[in-house]
Amino acid sequence: MPEYQLQIKQVVDYPRCRIYREFIHKLINDRSIRINGGSGLFHFTVLCSYANFRTSYRRIDGISYTVSPGEWVCTVKELSCWFRTRFHRQALSMLDTLQKQHLISYTLLGRGNVVKYKILHWARHNSALEYNAPCQKDTGFFFLPVSVALELVSSARCSEMDIVLDLWVSAVYNDTQVQGSEVGPVAYFRNGTGNPLVSYTELSCRWGLSRATVCRILKKLCCDFRA
C-alpha cells in the first residue's frame, strides 16, 4: 500500500480562501501598510477573524453577553483600534457601510459603548458548532468567500491593506490549471486564461488606482515583505 502524502493546494475552482487569524492580527499591528480610504475588504476580514465558530460568552463591564457562531461582541474602543480609526464614529461608519452591503448586521449596546455584530451567511462557508465553549481569537483560521472579496474590491478605491488581502485571496498554489502555480503561490485573478501575468492597467482598473500608484504600492510591499 503506497504511503499517504498530504498535498497542500489552493485551487482556482475552490470558492473560498483560508485565512489565518494570526496573519490578520499581524496586519492590524503593521503600521507601515496604509488603510486610509479603502474598499472595506480589510475591515470585513478583521470582523471575520474575531467571529465565533461556536457559542460562547463574553463579559464586558460586568454584563455577560451570549455570542453565537458568526458573531462577536466588543467595545467601540476595541473596534476603533482594530480599524485604526482616529474617532469612534469612523469605525461605526464602516460598520454602516458593510451593513448596507448586506455583509453584516450590528447593534449598539451598553449605551452605545458596546458593539455586537454578526457576519451574515457565516455558516455557508465556516463551521458553526452547536456546543458552548470559549473560542480562540489568535489561532486557527476561517474561510473568506472569493466572491465577497471581489465584491468589496470592486466597490471602491482600494487601500494598501485591501491590496495585500486581495493578493492573498487571489493566490493559487499547485493547480495545473494555472501556469507557474506548481512552483509557488501566484496571484491569479480568475480571468479564464490560466495565465497569472497581469498588466498595470488591469490592476489599476481592479483597485481603482492610477498605474503609477499601483507600481509604487507593489514595489513597497515587495520591499516590506522581503525585509
Please report, for each region that a protein language model flagged, where it lies by residue.
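Short, cationic-aromatic polyanion-contact patches
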Residues: L109-A133, S199
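Winged helix-turn-helix DNA-binding recognition segment
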Residues: F53-V115, D175-A227
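Short alpha-helical "packing" element that flanks the helix-turn-helix/winged-helix DNA-binding module
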Residues: G40-L47, I163-L167
